[in-house]
Curated annotation (Swiss-Prot):
InterPro entries, per the entry: AAA+_ATPase (IPR003593), ABC_transporter-like_ATP-bd (IPR003439), ABC_transporter-like_CS (IPR017871), P-loop_NTPase (IPR027417), PstB-like (IPR005670)
Protein source organism: Methanospirillum hungatei JF-1 (strain ATCC 27890 / DSM 864 / NBRC 100397 / JF-1)
Catalytic activity: phosphate(out) + ATP + H2O = ADP + 2 phosphate(in) + H(+)
Keywords annotated in UniProt: ATP-binding, Cell membrane, Membrane, Nucleotide-binding, Phosphate transport, Translocase, Transport
Name assigned to this protein: Phosphate import ATP-binding protein PstB
Length: 253
C-alpha cells in the first residue's frame, strides 16, 4: 500500500469479560480514503471501529491488548486523552441521534464546548458544515427549527455535519444507512464520496453492494478474525481467501 497510513492497528485483541471478541487484528487504515468493514453479524466489525475512538472504554469488563497507532502514537497509551481523541475521530451511529435542539444548535454545540463563542465564527461553522453534509440548501431557511422535525435521512446528514463541526480527521460510520430508505441512502453514499477528499472515512456495512460502491479498501472479518484486507475491487473480484469469496457470493452470512 502506497497510501499515507493514518491509523495502524497492530496485534489488537479485545475481550468483553471472558468473551475474546477480536483476535490479533493487524490493519493499516489509509488517509483520505474510504475503508469498509464487512462480515456477518457478530464478526467484530462494530467492536473494531469503536476501538478507534475508544468507545469500548465505556463498556464494563472490556480489556484491550496490542497497539492502535494514530499518527504514530498509541491511542491506548498512558497520557492519551480519550476526549480529545473523540474530537479528532468522530462517530456517526446506525440510528440518527440529533440533539433535541435546533438544527443550528446541533452543530454549534461542539465548537462551543471547545471554546468558540463568537456568533460570527459559529455562523460560519454551521453554514460550512451543512454545505459539506449536503444539507444547507434544504435547511438554510429554518436553522432554528427543531432537528427532530427533519426526515431520517436529513437527521443523519445533520449528525455528519455535527461531527464535522469540531474539525475531525477521521469519520467513523457504523451502518449509517441501515435505518434509511434507498433515496436517503443514495444521498449519504454521495456524501461519503465527497467527504473522502478531506477526511479518512471508515464505514461498517452489512451491504455488499454499498461496500463495493463507496469504499476504496475493504476488510472482511469473521468471528473476531480479520480474514482479508485489500483494495475493494480486488476483494470483490479476486479474493485471495476462500472464506472471503464464500461470504461475498452469499454462500453464508
Amino acid at each position: 500500500m502506497n497510501e499515507e497510513i493514518i491509523i495502524d492497528v497492530q496485534g489488537l485483541n479485545l475481550w468483553y469479560g471472558e468473551n475474546h471478541a477480536l483476535h490479533n487484528v493487524t490493519l493499516p487504515i489509509p488517509n483520505r480514503k474510504v475503508t469498509a468493514l464487512i462480515g456477518p453479524s457478530g464478526c467484530g466489525k462494530s467492536t473494531l471501529i469503536r476501538c478507534f475512538n475508544r468507545m469500548n472504554d465505556l463498556v464494563s469488563g472490556c480489556r484491550v491488548t496490542g497497539d492502535i497507532l494514530y499518527h504514530g502514537q498509541n491511542i491506548n497509551g498512558t497520557g492519551a486523552d480519550p476526549v480529545d481523541l473523540r474530537r479528532k475521530i468522530g462517530m456517526v451511529f446506525q440510528k440518527p441521534n440529533p440533539f433535541p435542539k435546533s438544527i443550528y444548535e446541533n452543530i454549534a454545540y461542539g465548537p462551543r464546548i471547545h471554546g468558540i463563542k463568537n456568533k460570527r465564527d459559529l455562523d460560519e461553522i454551521v453554514e460550512s458544515c451543512l454545505h459539506k453534509a449536503a444539507l444547507w440548501e434544504e435547511v438554510k431557511d429554518r436553522l432554528h427549527d427543531s432537528a427532530m422535525s427533519l426526515s431520517g435521512g436529513q437527521q443523519q446528514r445533520l449528525c455528519i455535519a455535527r461531527t464535522l463541526a469540531v474539525n475531525p480527521e477521521i469519520i467513523l460510520m457504523d451502518e449509517p444507512c441501515s435505518a434509511l430508505d434507498p433515496i436517503a441512502t443514495s444521498k449519504i453514499e454521495d456524501l461519503i464520496e465527497e467527504l473522502k477528499k478531506e477526511y479518512c472515512v471508515i464505514i461498517v456495512t452489512h451491504s455488499m453492494s454499498q461496500a463495493s460502491r463507496v469504499s476504496d479498501y475493504t476488510a472482511f472479518m469473521y468471528l473476531g478474525d480479520l480474514i482479508e484486507f485489500g483494495e475493494t475491487r480486488q476483494i470483490f473480484e479476486n479474493p485471495h481467501k476462500e472464506l472471503t469469496e464464500n461470504y461475498i457470493t452469499g454462500r453464508f452470512g
